[in-house]
């Protein structure tokens, strides 16, 4: 049923694209957004006023908070399944010289018949531990029609922005990219980590976290239907005794996981921070514990230690899929229990040097001016 809906959805978009063949190419840029971070960085740079083209921002429901952040820009919130919204989005794209997207959108397939419109993919993460695209484990179970549709979407990307050669190689494999289509500008969302940083104690005060404690941020990846396996890296007892009461464990969960996870209430040692902005949490944290999430790629820009709590690595690799050589790529070693995590914490200098190596490799081109480089490139193409 799902495949049939996807087929008719794709067909509807193609029909709309054909019916709007008369739309003339304009000088505007359309920004199609599903995650706010890259778009926020791009729009902040755009507002500095150095660019000659108008911009139209199309926000999906997940990114609609940006509408309030940029009230002076032309911003529309769209429902990708609403026929009128689809027509509006396709019209805007066909009226653009450049279309910038941050995710997989079937909408971009209308651009394959319009070589005069350049589609630029600015992926919503600056690194990847999980397989996606054509190499996603679940893709093996999809029909040939589904896979052909996936390929048509990936083929619509004329350019892909990358922050490292590692990500360029991943896109080549996961999207089956032929040739060098990459813009080595760095990933826009990383620009924020080069701006003046708010004092960590000020941030702790803002969010009512104890100033005297160091913060361990635990930010695990989303787990599909595996809530029963959710595990905290440390217990309250370990935080009090093994870590000498110096740390607060701040837990940032995906909304779906938050509904099912049982976290201690009114604890002095463990606090649910799932509703707080990730960027602020990263800036105020002294240590990150994650697993297969892309969060470590951002946190590495802050030159702070990272631990990997991978208690379900084999099961996760079977059901979701990890990149090759995951255990060699991560800075440090995978830890399957809290005892291993505590052992790793004894050598902070080694953890720090591993993070520096990791960031050099994965944030090679992200140097604080990614948004400016991207918009300057688009500006030159528009003139």
Swiss-Prot record:
Keywords, in A-Z order: Cell membrane, Cell wall biogenesis/degradation, Membrane, Teichoic acid biosynthesis, Transferase
EC no. given is 2.7.8.44
Record GO biological process:
cell wall organization; teichoic acid biosynthetic process
Q: How does it sit in the membrane?
A: Peripheral membrane protein
Please give the GO cellular component terms listed in this UniProt entry: plasma membrane
Reactions that this protein is recorded to catalyse: N-acetyl-beta-D-mannosaminyl-(1->4)-N-acetyl-alpha-D-glucosaminyl di-trans,octa-cis-undecaprenyl diphosphate + CDP-glycerol = 4-O-[(2R)-glycerylphospho]-N-acetyl-beta-D-mannosaminyl-(1->4)-N-acetyl-alpha-D-glucosaminyl di-trans,octa-cis-undecaprenyl diphosphate + CMP + H(+)
Instruction: Using the record for this protein, list the coiled-coil segments as residue ranges, or answer none.
Output: none
- The main place the protein resides is membrane
Write out the annotated subcellular location: Cell membrane
Q: In which pathway does it act?
A: Cell wall biogenesis; poly(ribitol phosphate) teichoic acid biosynthesis
InterPro entries, alphabetized: Glycerophosphate_synth (IPR007554), TagF_C (IPR043148), TagF_N (IPR043149), Teichoic_Acid_Biosynth (IPR051612)
Provide a Gene Ontology MF annotation, just one: CDP-glycerol glycerophosphotransferase activity
Q: What does this protein do?
A: Catalyzes the addition of a single glycerol phosphate residue to the prenoldiphosphate-linked disaccharide.
Please state which protein family the record places this protein in. Belongs to the CDP-glycerol glycerophosphotransferase family.
Q: Name it.
A: Teichoic acid glycerol-phosphate primase
| Species for this entry | Bacillus spizizenii (strain ATCC 23059 / NRRL B-14472 / W23)
